A protein has these predicted regions:
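Bilobed "Venus flytrap"/periplasmic-binding protein-like clamshell domains
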Residues: 34-37, 44-57, 117-181, 203-204
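Short amphipathic alpha-helical coupling segments at ligand-binding clamshell hinges
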Residues: 47, 51, 241-264
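Acidic, polar ligand-binding/catalytic clefts
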Residues: 53, 65-141, 221-230
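Ligand-binding clefts/hinges and TM-proximal coupling segments of bilobed small-molecule sensing domains
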Residues: 62, 150, 154-167, 251-280
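Extracytoplasmic small-molecule ligand-binding "clamshell" domains
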Residues: 23-97, 101, 177-180, 267-271
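Bacterial N-terminal signal peptides
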Residues: 7-18
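Periplasmic-binding protein-like
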Residues: 33-36, 112-116, 124-125, 210-254, ...
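Alpha-to-beta junction loops
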Residues: 61-62, 80-96, 145, 185-186, ...
Length: 280
């Protein structure tokens, strides 16, 4: 049974949908990156695209995107961009932002994930069950590894804490080329033999493993929550400040569609945690 519309009817009863859910506007306008898998792309192949489609269907709308690379200026050029002639904003929701993000109001989180180690099925790393097992490798093996990491990330902090910075292969968090994204960087560098293992955001690690499942299977090893270095983050949807009714609409939808959302995320291999940071 499809519970989407009955649950949205309940949202209406509770007063959550008057501004957007019952609007005559037939379009759900989504702010998104055109080339940033596993999150989104123009072909609609990312999990954020899938979530947006589910949301639009339940609201009786179709999805329309405003595209801009996910980097500095993203919110200004999408969610906050207003047409002076029509008074309309370019788009009305960002599907994935950190909960509590300072540039937008945020819904309740719809997922929590964690950073992970990923390697391209190396036999000499098969013994790793946890990220900290990397530190237990024989010194002559450990100190030969080249570890890919993005500057300013928790992975960089972890390497610093464990005196492994000399082995780090650092990548900038943002590239000047909008066609380059973190997943493509790690995939290219791993294939070229420039790195042996990488520390990346969990959804990226899971996606890379899924993409290579038919060849040399990539291995994903999530970090454990750490009191000193934050590896896990809740992810929410971002809306404009002051649009309480729209935020309430999305909160209600998220509450009633957790199972569906988690199903989509699992298809992409996203490491998921519950509210207490325990693996799901």
């Amino acid at each position: 049974m499809n519970w989407g519309r009955p649950l949205l009817t309940l949202c209406v009863t509770l007063g959550a949908l008057p501004a957007f859910g019952q609007s005559p506007d037939p379009v759900l306008r989504v702010c998104s990156d055109p080339q940033n898998l596993p999150f989104s792309n123009r072909a609609g192949e990312g999990f954020e695209n899938r979530i947006a489609q589910e949301l639009a269907r339940d609201l009786g709308k179709t999805v329309e995107y405003t595209w801009f690379p996910q980097r500095m200026g993203f919110v200004r050029n999408t969610l906050r961009k207003k047409d002076d002639a029509t008074g309309k904003f370019a788009c009305d929701v960002i599907i994935g932002v950190p909960a509590g993000y300072e540039l937008t109001a945020t819904t309740k989180p719809y997922m929590r994930s964690i950073y992970a180690l990923v390697h391209a099925g190396r036999k000499d790393l098969d013994s790793l069950d946890t990220a900290d097992d990397l530190l237990k490798l024989p010194p002559e093996q450990l100190h030969k590894l080249r570890i890919g990491v993005f500057a300013g990330s928790p992975g960089a902090d972890w390497l610093l804490r464990n005196q492994l910075l000399e082995q780090a292969v650092n990548f900038p968090r943002q590239s000047g080329d909008p066609a380059v994204n973190p997943a493509s960087v790690i995939e290219h560098e791993m294939a070229a033999g420039n790195i042996d293992v990488a520390i990346v955001w969990g959804p990226i690690a899971g996606y890379l493993a899924r993409e290579h499942s038919s060849s040399a299977a990539w291995h994903v090893i999530p970090f454990s929550p750490d009191p000193q270095i934050r590896f896990d983050y809740p992810i929410a949807m971002g809306v404009r400040f002051g649009e309480k009714e729209w935020k309430d609409t999305l909160d209600c939808w998220i509450d009633s569609h957790q199972e569906k959302i988690q199903g989509i995320l699992r298809e992409y291999g996203v490491p998921l945690l519950d509210e207490t940071a325990k693996p799901l």
